[in-house]
């Protein structure tokens, strides 16, 4: 299996979209925006945030030191951070080298078209002060975004 899950975090640490695939043989299996994934989202964002903070402290001067992927024995986490503070995260098997360009494409061609340019979609997913720091409950539910994202990622799920 190539891709296990896909996550989008906003600038307030909230998981605003998550998709998890459970069966390699069926790219339609799994969950979208599931309540069960909330704890996993917090752990994943916490790990990325902590490693990013460490790399910024270790980098000298004005040299930009971004995290693009994190590897473990069985998994690889691919990340892409936008200028507006959105984090696009893809969890894949260890064999996949880089999904940075895939994440950039998802942001620039799918997210911008179906979420950012949609006047009915919220600009900021944290409605008030209480929904910051990972406490937000609003998710991306745009059917067009979900279907285009599904069709784009489906071939990579079964790699």
Swiss-Prot record:
Q: Which GO terms describe its biological process?
A: endoplasmic reticulum to Golgi vesicle-mediated transport; intra-Golgi vesicle-mediated transport; macroautophagy; retrograde transport, endosome to Golgi
Q: Which family does it belong to?
A: Belongs to the TRAPP small subunits family. BET5 subfamily.
Among the Pfam families in the record, one is Sybindin
> What job does the chain carry out?
Component of the TRAPP I, TRAPP II and TRAPP III complexes which act as guanine nucleotide exchange factors (GEF) for YPT1. TRAPP I plays a key role in the late stages of endoplasmic reticulum to Golgi traffic. TRAPP II plays a role in intra-Golgi transport. TRAPP III plays a role in autophagosome formation. Required for sporulation. Has a role late in meiosis following DNA replication.
Name a single GO cellular component. TRAPPII protein complex
Q: Which SMART domains match?
A: Sybindin (SM01399)
The record's InterPro entries line, in alphabetical order, gives: Longin-like_dom_sf, TRAPPC
What is the recorded name of this protein? Trafficking protein particle complex subunit BET5
How does the annotation summarize its subunit structure? Part of the multisubunit TRAPP (transport protein particle) I complex composed of BET3, BET5, TRS20, TRS23, TRS31 and TRS33. Part of the multisubunit TRAPP (transport protein particle) II complex composed of BET3, BET5, TRS20, TRS23, TRS31, TRS33, TRS65, TRS85, TRS120 and TRS130. Part of the multisubunit TRAPP (transport protein particle) III complex composed of BET3, BET5, TRS20, TRS23, TRS31, TRS33 and TRS85.
Entry keyword NAD = no
The protein's UniProt keywords, in alphabetical order, are: Autophagy, Endoplasmic reticulum, ER-Golgi transport, Golgi apparatus, Transport
Annotated localization: Golgi apparatus, cis-Golgi network; Endoplasmic reticulum; Preautophagosomal structure
């Amino acid at each position: 299996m190539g891709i296990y899950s896909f996550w989008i975090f906003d600038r307030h640490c909230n998981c605003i979209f998550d998709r998890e695939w459970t069966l390699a043989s069926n790219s339609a299996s799994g969950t979208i925006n599931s309540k069960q994934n909330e704890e996993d989202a917090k752990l994943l964002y916490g790990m990325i945030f902590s490693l990013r903070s460490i790399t910024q402290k270790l980098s000298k001067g004005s040299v930009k030191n971004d995290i693009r992927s994190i590897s473990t024995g069985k998994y690889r986490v691919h990340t892409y951070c936008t200028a507006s503070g959105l984090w696009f995260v893809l969890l894949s098997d260890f064999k996949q080298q880089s999904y940075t360009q895939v994440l950039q494409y998802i942001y620039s061609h799918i997210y911008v078209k179906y979420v950012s340019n949609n006047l009915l979609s919220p600009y900021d997913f944290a409605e008030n002060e209480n929904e910051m720091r990972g406490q937000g409950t609003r998710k991306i539910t745009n059917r067009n975004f979900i279907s285009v994202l599904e069709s784009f990622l489906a071939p990579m799920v079964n790699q």
